[in-house]
Every structure is written in structure tokens, then in C-alpha cells.
């Protein structure tokens, strides 16, 4: 992790050290199980950590906000977000057992008390959340249909409870017909 990322995101020394440790754990685990594309692993800081932290430019979550990381894979964006938002509860889920086993191990080694992990399909959840975050897991319409009834009724943050989806490329067709959404340019 470079100094410019530390400055860009206003990381504390502890947050910086946790992100470095996270990166090391991902690199170690990635030798055994494909969490991050082998072609992309050398760009982990920019393409994965910085991308995950970019939410902090736009959202300042209040204490006890509940966030579901749908299809967390290698713990992205949930683990980096849990590091910079220690007052927020993150629930990281994935349908792939070996991935969620790794993510649970990483969260334990990082001592992230605000992270819960589960090997579960979103349709089997019986909890409610303020936000659902997801990084390139599925189309908006598929995520919407799976999660539309998962939100808490009371809004406690500046933004209305809902989805925070990390998308790339031209998303105009994907969001055609969606009444209300916001887009943010990252880097």
C-alpha cells in the first residue's frame, strides 16, 4: 500500500497496518485457492483495496449500521470497509464454502469484531440490513429481486437504505427502467 492511498483515504496507522496484513493474507491464501484472479493479483492495492475503500468518499455510516456484503468472494469489499468503518456491523456471505472459510479465517486473524461471515445463500437469510453492498456479483435486477425485502424500515444514515453496487463499464442498459439510482465516478 502506498502513501498516496493512505493520504487519499485518510487512513490511521492501525487501519494501514490492517490493510497491509489483509493483503498479505490474501496473497498467501491465493496460492491455495483462487480468491483473486492470478492475472490481477499484482494490482490488488489499486483494483481491489482502493476500489473497496472508494465508498468512503460518498458514504459516512453511522454507528450500528448493518451492511450485508453479498457474494464477498475474497472479502471484498467487506473486509476493507470493516477496517475503515469499525463502528459498522458487516455480514459477509458467499455461496462458495471454501471462500467463506478463508474470509472467516482472515477476519479472525485481523481481529475484526465487526465482521460476521456465513456460508449461505441470500434467499435463506432471515436478517435485515441498512445496506447491501456487492462487487460485480450479478446484475442489478437479479440482486434487487433477491434482496428487495431485506432492508430495515428505519433509515439512520444520510442516504436511504438500499444497494451500494460496484459496477464497471457502461451501466445504462442495466439500470434502464430503475426509478432512482445514483452513480459515482471513482478513479
Give the ranges of each region predicted by the language model.
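Class I SAM-dependent transferase core
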Residues: 1-68, 98-115
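Residue-level recognition of conserved structural "scaffold" positions that shape functional pockets
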Residues: 59, 78-80, 175
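Conserved S-adenosyl-L-methionine
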Residues: 69-73
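Conserved SAM-binding loop of SAM-dependent methyltransferases across substrates and taxa
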Residues: 74-87
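S-adenosylmethionine
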Residues: 87, 91, 95-187
Amino acid at each position: 500500500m502506498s502513501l498516496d492511498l493512505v493520504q487519499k483515504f485518510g487512513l490511521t496507522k492501525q487501519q494501514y497496518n490492517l490493510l497491509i496484513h489483509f493483503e498479505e493474507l490474501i496473497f498467501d491464501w491465493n496460492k491455495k485457492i483462487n480468491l483473486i484472479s492470478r492475472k490481477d493479483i499484482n494490482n490488488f492495492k489499486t483494483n481491489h483495496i482502493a476500489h473497496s475503500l472508494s465508498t468512503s468518499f460518498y458514504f459516512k455510516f453511522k454507528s450500528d449500521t448493518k451492511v450485508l456484503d453479498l457474494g464477498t468472494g475474497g472479502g471484498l469489499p467487506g473486509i476493507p470497509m470493516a477496517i475503515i468503518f469499525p463502528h459498522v456491523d458487516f455480514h459477509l456471505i458467499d455461496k462458495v464454502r471454501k471462500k467463506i472459510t478463508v474470509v472467516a479465517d482472515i477476519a479472525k486473524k485481523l481481529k475484526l469484531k465487526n465482521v460476521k461471515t456465513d456460508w449461505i445463500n441470500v434467499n435463506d437469510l432471515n436478517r435485515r440490513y441498512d445496506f447491501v453492498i456487492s462487487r460485480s456479483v450479478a446484475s442489478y435486477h437479479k440482486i434487487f429481486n433477491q434482496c428487495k425485502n431485506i432492508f430495515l424500515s428505519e433509515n439512520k444514515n444520510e442516504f436511504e437504505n438500499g444497494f451500494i453496487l460496484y459496477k464497471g463499464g457502461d451501466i445504462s442498459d442495466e439500470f434502464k427502467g430503475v426509478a432512482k439510482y445514483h452513480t459515482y465516478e471513482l478513479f
